[in-house]
């Protein structure tokens, strides 16, 4: 496998394959979870199952050959929830238009990937605020997960209240969440998918959550125009996404993908010292970011929300993966999932939504690295995190976070800590509020 430069990276074929299998087990949960979440927009579940598997194959394989890094890519958790509940359902925007917004944001990101923009972002946006955004998205998707599970529910007096714990549906969801947390806590590989499958089998046996055993496990991929991939492939509406009212949504997709990809890719690279090479390190990072943006644009065309680098790639890196062969093995494994449509369709909803909560917990753990001793960071981080679930809007939380950061720095006259990046993002945030006021 000379193409992947295994000898130069001091890797063996066996090590890379094991690393790829490890990453696959850690992230295969995305197929049932993403299709279940985005299916709330009205897109056919069968089409989404096929699209999720297909774009994971294409994006991961593209990164394998283009960047030669062990970073697998798929539909991003958090942004798929934002796409569904905040954009399509919350603002009554057609999924075709939302896909158009994803495509536009991805093209902008791809164009900027050819410049030094990403390095400018790393230098100018405080790391603490980037961590707060990650933690905020974690709160947001955990809130959505608990809501969909029925653990919390709307209350006209208190806005939110506890759900009906007499409901078998709610109790089954709590059991699944506890099972996933248990598998994760004991560091079991593939904890998420094992938790989903184990609880699904229990649901099938006891007919919980209206579940029953799938009639068959395997089938040919569904590419039909009725409820298969053909129903969502190339259905994005770019024209309607260019409407001025879509600007905040496009900016949200762009900024979140930017911070998410930079954080994930550099984090994965740090685990394996992948980008430390003074000669090729920055080139590899640049190519991986380009692959990330390309995958997202292709994802919108295929019918999925934002595609991004998966943090689960760290499991493969920790297993010894250092080259694109790891990502290629992930792509090959996902190719087999194209034939498991009946199995994924039979998984009950409350065996899936607990994954949202667990992913939210992992994302929220980033707060441990935030410097709360700095008053500007503390105030901005608080608003960034808390306003996401409170307003059902990632855009609004960005605005509160960046503006409050700038204001506290001004109040304290810490002019040396105010840079062009903060000023630009604060002006964009102010513009977002003005757009909201004019609507």
Show where each model-derived region lies.
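Transmembrane alpha-helix interface/packing and boundary motifs in multi-pass membrane proteins
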Residues: 59-71, 182-187, 252-260, 292-302, ...
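Helix-coil boundary and interhelical linker segments in multi-pass alpha-helical membrane proteins
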Residues: 36-47, 86-97, 244-247, 348, ...
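Transmembrane helix-loop junctions in multipass membrane proteins, especially transporters and channels
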Residues: 39, 64, 68, 72, ...
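Membrane-embedded alpha-helical modules
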Residues: 91-205, 209, 328-439
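Helix-loop-helix junctions within the multi-pass membrane cores of secondary transporters/permeases
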Residues: 1-34, 55, 75-85, 89-134, ...
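Residue-level signature of catalytic and energy-coupling elements of molecular machines
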Residues: 17, 37, 121, 190, ...
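Loop-to-helix transition at the N-terminal end of transmembrane alpha-helices
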Residues: 41-61
